[in-house]
């Protein structure tokens, strides 16, 4: 397994936690999904959530963003309990960017119109809105495809578009749900390099969930392995391989 990420973080002891889950449990129709889950995403860290499909990885993201509410436990972002804030305010209050596994864009709109539509919602100042759109076009090298309807983009281009849309509100935290699913090997390599560069350039914290160890462990600082509703292991990629 080729390690793309040269581990910048030598010690996690002095890092500032940006997201903290404390003994979080969640059930759906009396079926346990998460059982007393606790972990920290540190500022400037790329953290992986690893486990088979159905183990609760996406549920964790839905709890953080407010789409779901835990049965027990607390979710702390920037020293604030997110459960005290309305769902509609969480993305802006806590500067969260979320990239879903599927969709996340307007299929029939062109790439540039996707950027404009989301920027219109999130950014009130016209000049700031124009600047951030131009930044995304440059950063993701969209120049040659800005007028193509999103539904005609390749899998990798669609994923880059959704990441760009998630970055429009200048988030502190980026959540990526199964970003490598259904992509070819070369596109996965490109996307992993993009994620690592994003963290380095934008200084944001990133949490990625995936079910493939070979994809996830090559681009994270640390990872958590989930099984049977619980965390069964934590560590750096070299410790977990």
Model segments located where?
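The feature captures the beta-strand-to-loop junction immediately N-terminal to the Walker
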Residues: 50-52
